[in-house]
Amino acid sequence: MGNHAMLLEKHTAVRKGRLHDGKVMVMRSNLRWCSDGLEFACWNGEVIRLAFIIDAFDREIIAWTAVANAGISGSDVRDMMLEAVEKRFHATRAPHAIEHLSDNGSAYTARDTRLFAQALNLTPCFTPVASPQSNGMSEAFVKTLKRDYIRISALPDAQTALRLIDGWIEDYNEIHPHSALKMASPRQFIRAKSI
């Protein structure tokens, strides 16, 4: 195909947004939010895809979205970003810049998503390609969700799974202990910090 000039030119545009420097932990809430996604299968073969935003300090899942038998779209990610800002600040724009760390998935790197993030005062930041450990906070949550919730739940179909996710996230935020939070749940930790 190359001999007949049938190949597309290489993409040469430089993507705005810096690569992640490898440091995930921060010293207070709302400095860095990490985002990632996962998928799991129901017993009937239907597939659920879930994306979430987690605070790198207090570990609370601030917002999430899930779909059945489809991919997470840029629109889903943008809605999730807005929901996170609204939940944390009761406004449509964060009062200060927040680093939004994600992988290089197309829903996150899309131009519309990056511009929308900037309008919310979120600074898009991307992990190096093929380096999931650079977003360890998100990867740890994925492992916890699969081990402590998905694996032990009856998931006959997508409709059942989608109904259960809200309860899993609520349990994780309110009850699930974290060693990094001195065995408190994310919300217990947040409440203790605000006293």
Curated annotation (Swiss-Prot):
> Which parts of the chain span the membrane according to its record?
none
- Keyword Repeat in annotation: no
User: Could you tell me which Gene3D superfamilies the record lists for this protein?
Assistant: Ribonuclease H-like superfamily/Ribonuclease H
GO annotation terms (biological process): DNA integration
Q: Name one Pfam family in it.
A: rve
Domain of life, per UniProt, equals Bacteria
Q: Which UniProt keywords apply?
A: Transposable element
Residues forming the Integrase catalytic domain are 25-194
Coiled-coil region(s) at which residues?
A: none
Q: Which GO terms describe its molecular function?
A: nucleic acid binding
| Keyword Transcription annotated | no
According to UniProt, the name of this protein is Insertion element IS136 uncharacterized protein Atu4601
